[in-house]
């Protein structure tokens, strides 16, 4: 417990000056040929179809296909908390045809907690563009009869058995949030990982598991239907469309002001001119009204970053979440 809380303490210690000291990756490569892209492009989504990463991959595939006049296909390659699909991209030729939807599970938590990670999350990738982030919502099945996070904590303390909670998978931000809450409040929560949010929420709404830590994207319809009760959200401010839902910060969990994020990366040593063009096109996509509308509907907040800024962001997230991930996952074993 003390190891995990110490790791969380490191999160708040990261400041702007710390971020400024982190060097961005500067891949060395030749400029792209004048005919690039000369063949179909592939965006690997290292998660199953139906989740936020999949939606973002398909949005970007459509935009880039139109922008470059080339076919762009989306390939779902889930497994090992996103490392299977990500490794395929890390080992691909840097010819501008293969990319990945990157994020916290695959490029921050999994590499930090695996003794045999098949890639370095910074050195083996060209980090091209940040897309956006969404907060985690703590939910309870209506049959549990709790209406607040404090009631959930009290219920867990009264229970003689560990209370199961679901997340989209090992190393997801929902996993991290749940593990921290368990130790902070000295309650017994058992992490039940799934291969994506769609499968996790299916069992949650069926009542097979009583607690969830997932994005607003996957839980909102069931919260509005009354099947799930929203208890707290990890955003810095309350949702405009659900102002009654308190933030974790308000409830005394200031370390958990955070979002799970999605981004666009490719193999290391992509030509800088190519990286810049891709960054510009993705930022254009984020400005498109239809794209903004789709992402806002899923509570995904976009932000534009240059490739250098995004690379520094990834490095900062590794320093921020890596120690916490090692403490949480190491404490409960790699099987979860």
Show where each model-derived region lies.
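Hinge/capping helix and adjacent helix->loop/strand transition within the periplasmic-binding protein
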Residues: 91-97, 104, 112-199, 248, ...
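An extracytoplasmic/periplasmic, membrane-proximal ligand-sensing/linker region
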Residues: 26, 38-40, 183, 224, ...
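A ligand-binding cleft/hinge motif common to bilobed small-molecule-binding domains
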Residues: 106-115, 180-184, 211-245, 322
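Positively charged n-region of N-terminal signal peptides that target proteins for export
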Residues: 1-4
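N-terminal (or domain-start) structured segment
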Residues: 21-123, 161, 170, 186-211, ...
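Short beta-strand/turn micro-motifs at beta-sheet edges
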Residues: 30-33, 124-128, 249-255
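Bacterial N-terminal signal peptides
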Residues: 6-18
